[in-house]
């Protein structure tokens, strides 16, 4: 799934999702992080791990980035801060309505958002491929309708 894939790590934070994708074969990973200090540490991690040829850091607000983004990504990781419950819905809507989702969408969210996330999947014709839970955190791997036919 990740071999040579173009990936987007939205709300990158520590960058663990995007850098892991890069380390196991992604072709290119864009990491988006709005907090300056976090982005600075993320840039240092990319440099330390010699991932600069695969990873591109965008120090930007996720919503603004999605509004300007034109190219689709094979895999998109969305793990927004749980405190702002509107971020997840806004991001998924922007991704789907902007034609940015190529094949796979990975979401991490609080269990209290599960019904809202299910509604988003229905709204955009997406399919849940795999789900896990750890305490109150839900992790869902979602595929596009086209991908689920294979």
Task: Name the predicted role of every residue range.
Residues 1-150:
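Class I S-adenosyl-L-methionine-dependent methyltransferase catalytic core
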